[in-house]
Amino acid sequence: MKVVVATTQDLFVRGGGATYHAEGLATALTALGHEVETVRIPFGWRHKYEVLRQAYQWRMLDLRETGADLVITLKFPAFYVRADRKRAWVLHQHRPLYDNFDRPEYSAFSSSIPEDVAIRDAVVRWDTAYLGEMERIFTNSRTVADRLREYNGLEGEPLYHPPPLAARLRSGPFGDYVLWVGRLEANKRPGLLLEALALTKSRVRAIVAGRGPLEDALREAAAAKGLEGRVELRGLVSEEEKIGLYAGARAVVYPPFHEDLGYVTLEAFLAGKPVITMADSGGPTEFVRDGVNGFVARDAASLASAIDAYAEDPDLAERHGAAGRATYAETIPSWDTVCQRLLEGA
């Protein structure tokens, strides 16, 4: 079968979940004997009001009569492409115009600005119409499916997939640190880790692996809270370093706000480590079972208590980590199974 994978591209950005998602799918389809082309159009804007122009570019892209048997779209606004047959596997929509609208910490769009409201209404209308053209709609999590139902009245089938380092992650000793992995930006809430550490009874260390716009602020906050000796900001680490950090962690702290899926949870479970997340973290809560394979905290104080529980009892961390590995095995399909689901009946 000739399959087109259609998605967006961030120029000069290497890695990232969306990039891996597209590359992983294309590689898996090719391994199964399909002929695959990946179509990417850069998505980004110098000004927030360029979002409609960016969306319109995708609607102008016509893949009909190109010989493609099926087009699989992944990310807004690739859903808008014209094709004889298309299916969506939705990573997420343009969240600044959806659940993050009117949240200044996560979105530049506000209901107090008429132009912003008009853009939001247009994108919601277009998403509903063009996703409605799909033969089938899949999502990468229940969280994304719930948003699609709430805002667009469309049903999506949650379809999980393996994380980037799935074949290479390994378990190791339960060391003296908790690990935080990801970009240092507002929606990942790295500041919550520092708030919690300041409240812990134990002197457990934290290693932060990642870079982003909040890096300097995080370093200043650690100093202000007297945590300099307990918080190590590693910056951007290599894949091998990340694998080693997962292997040696006591637990992984992952508290994003309404995350779509969250590879960190899955990677931690593959490394046999428990995960501490938040009740409003979205995707991670689809996997983390409170008191079974991790903890689901509700505020900085309960996050601190969860960190202390693992710091004081490495056997508990080991039991929860083993349960996390079992959760992964029960929940996450192989890439072959993912491809079979996406192409079923095509």
Predicted regions, residues:
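Membrane-proximal helix-turn-helix segments that form the acceptor-binding/catalytic region
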Residues: 109-137, 145
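Nucleotide-activated donor-binding/catalytic signature segment of Leloir-type glycosyltransferases, i.e.
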Residues: 219-237
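Aromatic "clamp/platform" in nucleotide-sugar-dependent glycosyltransferases that forms part
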Residues: 257
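Short hydrophobic beta-strand element within catalytic cores of glycosyltransferases
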Residues: 274-278
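Conserved acidic donor-binding segment of nucleotide-sugar-dependent glycosyltransferases
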Residues: 289-301, 309-315
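A charged, aromatic-enriched C-terminal amphipathic alpha-helix characteristic of glycosyltransferases
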Residues: 312-345
